[in-house]
């Protein structure tokens, strides 16, 4: 027979009930929680973080500094030396999507991850060790203003092609 299941929803503090034969409730949008390693841009619509690896194989998370509601930067080794700057622009009225602009000021390996907190879409840009990206101006992101588009996408900054090992994009 069917079984009654429960799932806690941290957004509203409620316990949601459903039958085992029914699909689980859709996940609630994530709230963007700004902390030392996370930027919340476009009024908390986008969660932005970066991880890095240097030439001595040391790893870490970039330390975030918000510059405005649409931009911020990250430092890796010294708070006085920015390593990455990121901007997310609301271009909904002109192109129907959000634009992502960023520039690395370092040649360490890094993975920049931008997540839409409403749709849970995730966009990752990978910069390989030893490569200094000349910047990235992405005006055709997966972040459509109507919430459509793939759930995930990953790009290698050397080619702007999907990163090796990236699965086929799935519609969200």
Locate predicted features.
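Polar/charged low-complexity regulatory segments
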Residues: 3-172
């Amino acid at each position: 027979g069917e079984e009654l299941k429960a799932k806690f929803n941290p957004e509203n503090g409620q316990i949601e009930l459903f039958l085992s034969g029914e699909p689980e409730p859709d996940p609630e949008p994530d709230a963007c929680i700004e902390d030392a390693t996370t930027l919340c841009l476009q009024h908390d619509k986008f969660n932005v973080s970066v991880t890095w690896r240097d030439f001595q194989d040391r790893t870490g998370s970039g330390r975030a500094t918000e510059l405005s509601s649409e931009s911020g930067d990250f430092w890796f080794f010294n708070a006085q030396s920015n390593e990455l700057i990121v901007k997310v622009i609301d271009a909904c009225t002109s192109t129907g999507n959000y634009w992502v602009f960023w520039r690395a000021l370092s040649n360490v390996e890094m993975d920049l991850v931008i997540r839409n907190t409403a749709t849970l879409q995730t966009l990752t840009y990978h910069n390989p060790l030893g490569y200094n990206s000349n910047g990235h101006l992405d005006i055709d992101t997966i972040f459509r203003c109507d919430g459509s588009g793939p759930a995930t996408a990953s790009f290698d900054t050397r080619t702007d092609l999907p990163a090796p090992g990236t699965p086929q994009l799935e519609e969200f």
